[in-house]
């Protein structure tokens, strides 16, 4: 196992793929900025040897795309979710080419929204190369909710969306609370919630 010892913990080692020699995420960003096509953009993403991120693409012709990036070890004997023995039975089998990670080009609904929620297609079969935890889906769901309203959105609409604070969980909680039979003083607090602008 090529890794470094963790000070003070005895025989414990850690390894981060993004610290491999030759990783050049900033150079990858430069390549992305100079890309003239979706194919060039995806090729540039292949140099993004960093922890997982979402990269999005748009061009002047109206094409849009999303590419999952980040260096991901190929683990054929374990998921990477928990620590394993350093006895040589859990070695990485290289790295998954970033270009093999999930991507979308010109989706049917004509938009794609990522707010650090899980956007990986359920059909993708290399989950240990993507991750196991994401942000709550509510912000992403709210962005999708707004974008689904139509294709005539303006720059002002986009500015408003950036500072949109509507809370989907609060709507769900109020709907649930409305079905409860409450006694005082809880009825009073529920009334307050009903007039909250989420």
Label each region the model flagged.
Residues 2, 15, 139-142:
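Basic side chains
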Residues 1-13:
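Single conserved hydrophobic/aromatic residue that forms the stacking wall/gate
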Residues 2, 43-44, 53, 96-103:
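Intrinsically disordered, low-complexity boundary segments flanking structured domains
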Residues 59-198:
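Long, compositionally biased non-active-site segments enriched in small/hydrophobic residues and glycine
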Residues 15-80:
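Gly/Pro-rich turn-and-neighbor structural signature
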Residues 11-20, 112-119:
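Short, compositionally biased low-complexity segments
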């Amino acid at each position: 196992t090529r890794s470094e010892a963790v000070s003070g913990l005895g025989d414990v080692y850690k390894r981060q793929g993004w610290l491999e020699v030759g990783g050049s995420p900033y150079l990858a960003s430069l390549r992305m900025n100079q890309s003239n096509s979706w194919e060039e953009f995806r090729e540039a993403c292949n140099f993004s040897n960093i922890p997982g991120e979402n990269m999005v693409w748009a061009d002047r012709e109206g094409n849009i795309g999303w590419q999952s990036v980040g260096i991901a070890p190929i683990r054929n004997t374990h998921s990477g979710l928990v620590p394993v023995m350093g006895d040589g039975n859990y070695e990485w089998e290289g790295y998954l080419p970033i270009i093999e990670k999930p991507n979308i080009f010109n989706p049917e609904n004509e938009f794609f929204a990522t707010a650090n929620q899980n956007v990986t297609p359920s059909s993708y079969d290399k989950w240990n190369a993507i991750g196991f935890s994401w942000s709550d889906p509510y912000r992403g769901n709210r962005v999708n909710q707004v974008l689904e309203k139509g294709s005539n959105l303006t720059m002002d609409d986009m500015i408003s969306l950036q500072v949109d604070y509507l809370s989907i969980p609060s709507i769900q909680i109020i709907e649930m609370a409305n079905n409860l039979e409450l006694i005082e003083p809880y009825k009073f607090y529920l009334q307050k919630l009903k007039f909250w602008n989420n």
